[in-house]
Amino acid sequence: MKLNSFSPLLEDDDELHLPELVYWASLGDVEQVEQLLAEGTDPNQTDDDGYSALQAAAENDHLAVVKLLVGKGANVAYKGEYTALQLAEMANHDEVVAYLKSL
């Protein structure tokens, strides 16, 4: 995996196995997520375990990234072990929950 030069992850990260979009979404980095989407990255990208960028953003309370991903076509109903909504609910992220329920 190749991340931007300022990324704290190594190019060949054997521990996390996070694709770029999932990684930046989990950190709430709107600019990096926008850049990847503009370059054609699938908004439904998942890691090896099926954890999506939308799930990562929702679970970590990054509403702006959640909205961006949804606006670019991320599947709100996608369910690995849990949906993005379920993850946000379990983490008590009320604004993310309210937004996802409004869709």
Task: Describe each model-derived feature in a short phrase.
Residues 1-39:
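Intrinsically disordered, low-complexity regulatory segments in ankyrin-centric signaling systems
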